[in-house]
């Protein structure tokens, strides 16, 4: 992850449509939902994401209901969508199934 986070300008936000196509771009962050076959599978995914987030020192807002996981990424310190959110979204995508 980059050391210095910067808010994404409009061009960078537009590039997220190709680099993070499964994510919804909100005014101040990125949101994505996954559905798994079971709670255990969902929790395993969350554990992997937690390890990524801890290494990046950038932690998601998330919820889990049975086999469903929803993640929202935003950079509170900067008040919006930043390069750190985009980088973490791409890292999460690298380990997530296409559900």
From Swiss-Prot:
Name of the protein this chain belongs to: Putative pterin-4-alpha-carbinolamine dehydratase
Source superkingdom: Bacteria
Family affiliation: Belongs to the pterin-4-alpha-carbinolamine dehydratase family.
Organism: Synechococcus sp. (strain CC9311)
Keyword Zinc-finger listed: no
Top-tier EC class: lyase
Enzyme Commission number(s): 4.2.1.96
Molecular function terms from GO: 4-alpha-hydroxytetrahydrobiopterin dehydratase activity
Reactions this protein catalyses: (4aS,6R)-4a-hydroxy-L-erythro-5,6,7,8-tetrahydrobiopterin = (6R)-L-erythro-6,7-dihydrobiopterin + H2O
Organism lineage: Bacteria, Bacillati, Cyanobacteriota, Cyanophyceae, Synechococcales
CDD domains cross-referenced by the UniProt entry: PCD_DCoH_subfamily_b
GO biological process, one term: tetrahydrobiopterin biosynthetic process
Record-linked InterPro entries: PCD_sf (IPR036428), Pterin_deHydtase (IPR001533)
Keyword annotations of the record: Lyase
